[in-house]
Regions:
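Conserved substrate/cofactor phosphate-moiety recognition/catalytic segment
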Residues: 16-75, 114-118
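Conserved GTP-binding G-domain of TRAFAC-class P-loop NTPases and closely related GTPase folds
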Residues: 1-8, 13-17, 21, 25-27, ...
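ATP-dependent NMP and nucleoside kinases share a basic, alpha-helical "lid"
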Residues: 37, 41-42, 83-126, 140
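Glycine-rich loops and low-complexity Gly/Arg-rich segments
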Residues: 30-31, 53-55, 102-105, 129-132
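Glycine-rich phosphate-binding loop used to anchor ATP phosphates in small-molecule kinases
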Residues: 54-103
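Charged, low-complexity, helix/coiled-coil-prone segments
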Residues: 1-13, 31-38, 78-85
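Short N-terminal micro-motifs specific to bacterial/archaeal maturation
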Residues: 1, 25, 50, 54, ...
Length: 157
């Protein structure tokens, strides 16, 4: 069976940790890892290093090119990204229909925001995001639903 597994949740919520704990790293495409391939961490206004968001078109173009190549071969693929917008997830649905894939989404949006903020502080400095970014992401999750046709899973299932 052809399977595309999407992670969904705010930065720092545990998506990448889930992938590591379940030995899925070799199957994962990570937007953050592609960002780091496109540009080294940059100095932020707070004097720490962070992952640049300046190359988003290139990052997502590369991610979808690699995803399509893997789907053409029928490979199992995990997407490590926030997947906070319904329209983004619909793009995966379109590809899944083309390549006859089943889509599952491990949804971390039930993790309390305060826990996510706490976890964010335990990340390496360059991977931490401002608290406002986490708050904005949680507000978006409240209005953006997982599309029909994508099976929602909880991290503990």
């Amino acid at each position: 069976m052809r399977v595309l597994l999407l992670m969904r949740g705010a930065p720092g919520v545990g998506k990448t940790t889930f992938i590591k704990e379940n030995n899925l790293e070799q199957f994962a495409l990570s937007a953050d890892e592609i960002r780091l391939l496109c540009q080294s961490p940059v100095m932020t206004t707070s004097g720490t290093f962070g992952i640049s968001q300046d190359n988003e078109k290139k990052v997502w173009s590369l991610l979808f090119q690699i995803l399509e190549a893997r789907m053409q071969r029928g490979e199992f693929v995990v997407i490590d990204a926030t997947n906070s917008k319904t329209v983004e997830m619909n793009r995966y649905k379109t590809m899944a229909q083309t390549y006859r894939y089943h889509i599952y989404c491990v949804d971390f949006t039930d993790v309390p925001m305060e826990e996510c903020k706490r976890r964010n502080l335990t990340r390496p400095d360059y991977k931490q995001v401002p608290e406002e970014a986490i708050e904005k992401m949680y507000a978006r999750f409240a209005t953006q639903q997982i599309p029909t046709g994508i099976v929602k899973l909880r991290p503990d299932e």
